[in-house]
Amino acid sequence: MSVDPACPQSLPCFEASDCKESSPMPVICGPEENYPSLQMSSAEMPHTETVSPLPSSMDLLIQDSPDSSTSPKGKQPTSAENSVTKKEDKVPVKKQKTRTVFSSTQLCVLNDRFQRQKYLSLQQMQELSNILNLSYKQVKTWFQNQRMKSKRWQKNNWPKNSNGVTQKASAPTYPSLYSSYHQGCLVNPTGNLPMWSNQTWNNSTWSNQTQNIQSWSNHSWNTQTWCTQSWNNQAWNSPFYNCGEESLQSCMQFQPNSPASDLEAALEAAGEGLNVIQQTARYFSTPQTMDLFLNYSTNMQPEDM
């Protein structure tokens, strides 16, 4: 076990001694030892040279591939252009429509019929087309176009006409009547006619007032009320009437069963009062006073009552 580690230690010393003694040997040995590596490198160089063309070919393939990819792209625009040209060739064919030129007589007949009837049935269109020497489709399209034109014209001119119609058709406004009167008569402050007709004649206060007028007319022609009101009115409380009031009251105090002598004595005591009463009775018995009472009762207002 002790000999084995000693051997490697002695060997480097021997090698070192050999190297010291022969100095040029390492110079020779160096290339000899490096030669196989050079050979290996030279052997590897052909291999690398043989391998290097492969990447170059791949590079060429990669470089060629974009060219191949771009080449169809260059062809695609041509196909698109061809398709566009084909579409352009087809579009004018679709737009080419034969426009029928109507004569003046045909237009007059069509317009006249359109004014009378905007929608025609199948038989009517066929009859009209036979009369005008036109096809059914031509008559149908003309009526459709004419209806569209009329609708467009109405739509454009409708606001102007509608404003004029509303201004003409609006009911005239009337001022409010009897503004200072009772609220029952203030039926329509704004003065619109339909509101006036609905509320005036259906109002309870108006009917009550008419009933009061009827009661007033009956009351004025009633004999009892007319006598009491005419005698109790302030207009008849004149000094001429008051002069015989005491004598009249003294006469009214006696009963109807009293003897005539007592009545004559009382009348003589009254003196001139009796003459005044007789004169007033004669005055009120004349037809002129009756007419005066009637005129007064009819001309009296409710406030006097």
UniProtKB/Swiss-Prot annotation:
<feature type="region of interest" description="Disordered">
    <location>
        <begin position="1"/>
        <end position="96"/>
    </location>
</feature>
<feature type="repeat" description="5">
    <location>
        <begin position="221"/>
        <end position="225"/>
    </location>
</feature>
<feature type="repeat" description="1">
    <location>
        <begin position="196"/>
        <end position="200"/>
    </location>
</feature>
<keyword id="KW-0677">Repeat</keyword>
<dbReference type="GO" id="GO:0005634">
    <property type="term" value="C:nucleus"/>
</dbReference>
<keyword id="KW-0371">Homeobox</keyword>
<feature type="region of interest" description="Required for DNA-binding">
    <location>
        <begin position="122"/>
        <end position="151"/>
    </location>
</feature>
<keyword id="KW-0804">Transcription</keyword>
<dbReference type="GO" id="GO:0000978">
    <property type="term" value="F:RNA polymerase II cis-regulatory region sequence-specific DNA binding"/>
</dbReference>
<feature type="region of interest" description="Sufficient for strong transactivation activity">
    <location>
        <begin position="241"/>
        <end position="305"/>
    </location>
</feature>
<feature type="compositionally biased region" description="Polar residues">
    <location>
        <begin position="65"/>
        <end position="83"/>
    </location>
</feature>
<dbReference type="GO" id="GO:0000981">
    <property type="term" value="F:DNA-binding transcription factor activity, RNA polymerase II-specific"/>
</dbReference>
<dbReference type="InterPro" id="IPR009057">
    <property type="entry name" value="Homeodomain-like_sf"/>
</dbReference>
<comment type="subunit">
    <text>Interacts with SMAD1. Interacts with SALL4. Interacts with ZNF281/ZFP281. Interacts with PCGF1. Interacts with ESRRB; reciprocally modulates their transcriptional activities. Interacts with NSD2.</text>
</comment>
<dbReference type="GO" id="GO:0006357">
    <property type="term" value="P:regulation of transcription by RNA polymerase II"/>
</dbReference>
<feature type="region of interest" description="8 X repeats starting with a Trp in each unit">
    <location>
        <begin position="196"/>
        <end position="240"/>
    </location>
</feature>
<dbReference type="InterPro" id="IPR050460">
    <property type="entry name" value="Distal-less_Homeobox_TF"/>
</dbReference>
<feature type="repeat" description="2">
    <location>
        <begin position="201"/>
        <end position="205"/>
    </location>
</feature>
<dbReference type="InterPro" id="IPR017970">
    <property type="entry name" value="Homeobox_CS"/>
</dbReference>
<feature type="repeat" description="4">
    <location>
        <begin position="216"/>
        <end position="220"/>
    </location>
</feature>
<keyword id="KW-0539">Nucleus</keyword>
<protein>
    <recommendedName>
        <fullName>Homeobox protein NANOG</fullName>
    </recommendedName>
</protein>
<keyword id="KW-0217">Developmental protein</keyword>
<dbReference type="GO" id="GO:0019827">
    <property type="term" value="P:stem cell population maintenance"/>
</dbReference>
<keyword id="KW-0805">Transcription regulation</keyword>
<dbReference type="GO" id="GO:0030154">
    <property type="term" value="P:cell differentiation"/>
</dbReference>
<comment type="similarity">
    <text>Belongs to the Nanog homeobox family.</text>
</comment>
<keyword id="KW-0010">Activator</keyword>
<feature type="repeat" description="7">
    <location>
        <begin position="231"/>
        <end position="235"/>
    </location>
</feature>
<feature type="repeat" description="8">
    <location>
        <begin position="236"/>
        <end position="240"/>
    </location>
</feature>
<dbReference type="InterPro" id="IPR001356">
    <property type="entry name" value="HD"/>
</dbReference>
<feature type="region of interest" description="Sufficient for transactivation activity">
    <location>
        <begin position="196"/>
        <end position="240"/>
    </location>
</feature>
<comment type="function">
    <text>Transcription regulator involved in inner cell mass and embryonic stem (ES) cells proliferation and self-renewal. Imposes pluripotency on ES cells and prevents their differentiation towards extraembryonic endoderm and trophectoderm lineages. Blocks bone morphogenetic protein-induced mesoderm differentiation of ES cells by physically interacting with SMAD1 and interfering with the recruitment of coactivators to the active SMAD transcriptional complexes. Acts as a transcriptional activator or repressor.</text>
</comment>
<dbReference type="GO" id="GO:0000976">
    <property type="term" value="F:transcription cis-regulatory region binding"/>
</dbReference>
<keyword id="KW-0678">Repressor</keyword>
<feature type="repeat" description="6">
    <location>
        <begin position="226"/>
        <end position="230"/>
    </location>
</feature>
<dbReference type="GO" id="GO:0003700">
    <property type="term" value="F:DNA-binding transcription factor activity"/>
</dbReference>
<dbReference type="Pfam" id="PF00046">
    <property type="entry name" value="Homeodomain"/>
</dbReference>
<feature type="repeat" description="3">
    <location>
        <begin position="206"/>
        <end position="210"/>
    </location>
</feature>
<dbReference type="GO" id="GO:0001227">
    <property type="term" value="F:DNA-binding transcription repressor activity, RNA polymerase II-specific"/>
</dbReference>
<keyword id="KW-0238">DNA-binding</keyword>
